[in-house]
Regions:
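Structural motif
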Residues: 3, 9-17, 242-253
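Short helix/loop capping segments that flank catalytic or ligand/cofactor-binding pockets
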Residues: 6, 32, 79-82, 86-88, ...
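Conserved acidic
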Residues: 7-8, 12, 22-25, 82, ...
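Active-site-proximal segment of RNA-dependent polymerases
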Residues: 8, 17-78, 139, 152
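Short, hydrophobic/amphipathic alpha-helical patches that form generic packing surfaces
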Residues: 14-29, 145-153, 253-264
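A generic structural motif
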Residues: 41-49, 99-111, 197-207
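Conserved polymerase palm-domain catalytic core
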Residues: 65-167, 172-181, 210
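Active-site and adjacent loop segments of nucleotide-processing enzymes
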Residues: 126, 130-133, 178-199, 204-360
Length: 360
């Protein structure tokens, strides 16, 4: 690829992260609240659970008479952060901490990055001007700040009423259907002038169940909408790297418990995670730091969908609209998982041993 955008994935020292985090972590969610005001409602979805995210999307969707959802993704956002973009972002932090020389010094280190790496034949040294160093304490905050403010400027440029659902470089823009053609025509060229490559990530959503945000879609339940993953993504939940069988059982119990909290009353998912719980063990893995910090554990906090009873007809229809699996096929899949018995030919797990010397 000729002259590709550089991607810097080396982390800085823990001391640097700690020193910068003392400033950015205390203002992060206050900045998110401030960004909400640019679009007239909750905009940055960081810190919300799936029920809350869905509630905010429904509220934004219902604020239009004939809405459409435009899925947008800034390709290689970190790599395309120019030094001008970083300086603008850093000035927002300096404004909140006037006179803090340490903060200014720390932020200055991000404008021109020097790094090195060892390889069998020697050592590589490099320098970048601009470019986000993936892993910096302000990566998520900075990306949200840049994206939301640019989207606000873009909507003002197009003179359109809009709501934004954002999580860094991943976002969905809601507008009236009659403004769709104008917005899609102007989007890519406008962002190119800003130094970013904005792409349409998937199909335009003409109904709420077709909105795709962070690989999730809204599904209606008797207690309101919740965000649900595509069934294909459950493959990631079905692979454990635990080195012994006891660890596998504990892992299954922990993932099953979190899964039921997230999707216990959702078609198919409830049956799958219930099978995990039946064959897993409670164990102490749920209290282990390595588990508490996983995506499943974080997403399930504050969720209690396993207490909402059996799958409702309205949920089956909404799930069908979102993912194309008919209610009949939903029941067939659920029955299959409900019949699984550990130790039989239909056991829910298989052990695979890696060749000697191979690690993951």
């Amino acid at each position: 690829k000729p002259d590709p955008a550089p991607r810097v994935i080396q982390t800085r020292s823990p001391v640097y992260h700690y020193r910068l985090g003392r400033y950015t972590r205390v203002i992060e969610h206050e900045i998110y609240k401030g960004l909400d005001g640019l679009f007239g409602g909750p905009t940055v979805m960081k810190g919300y659970n799936p029920d809350q995210v869905a509630t905010h999307i429904v509220e934004a969707w219902n604020s239009f008479s004939d809405p459409v959802g435009i899925p947008l993704d800034a390709s290689r956002f970190d790599q395309h952060c120019s030094i001008d973009a970083l300086k603008w972002e850093h000035n927002q932090y300096r404004f909140l901490f006037p006179g803090e020389r340490e903060l200014s010094w720390l932020l200055k280190r991000q404008e021109r990055n020097k790094g090195y790496g060892d390889y069998p034949g020697g050592q590589i040294k490099y320098q970048t001007v601009g470019c986000r160093m993936s892993g910096d304490m302000n990566t998520g905050l900075g990306n949200c700040l840049l994206m939301v403010c640019m989207m606000r400027a873009f909507c003002d440029h197009c003179k359109v009423k809009a709501r934004l659902i954002n999580n860094g470089d991943d976002c969905v823009l809601l507008v009236e259907r009659d403004r769709l053609a104008h917005v899609t025509h102007e989007c890519a060229p406008w962002f190119i002038r800003m130094g970013f490559n904005m792409k349409f990530e998937g199909d335009i959503a003409y109904r709420i169940e077709h909105i795709t945000f962070c690989q999730l879609r809204p599904v209606r339940t008797p207690t309101g909408y919740t965000m649900v993953r595509d069934l294909k993504s459950i493959v990631k939940d079905a692979a454990s790297l635990q080195p012994n069988i006891d660890g596998v059982y504990a892992w299954m119990g922990a993932v099953g418990e979190c899964g039921l909290a997230l999707a216990g009353d959702i078609p198919v998912y409830g049956a799958i995670y219930a099978a995990y719980c039946r064959h897993g063990s409670a164990g102490r893995v749920r209290n282990h730091n390595n588990f508490r910090n996983t995506g499943m554990a974080i997403a399930s906090r504050g969720m209690n969908r396993f207490a909402n009873g059996p799958v409702a007809d309205i949920t089956r229809v909404s799930y069908y609209l979102a993912f194309g699996i008919s209610p009949t096929h939903q029941v067939i899949i659920e029955n299959r998982f409900n019949e699984l018995v550990a130790g039989s030919d239909a056991s829910p797990f298989t052990l695979h041993h890696l060749p000697k010397g191979i690690t993951i």
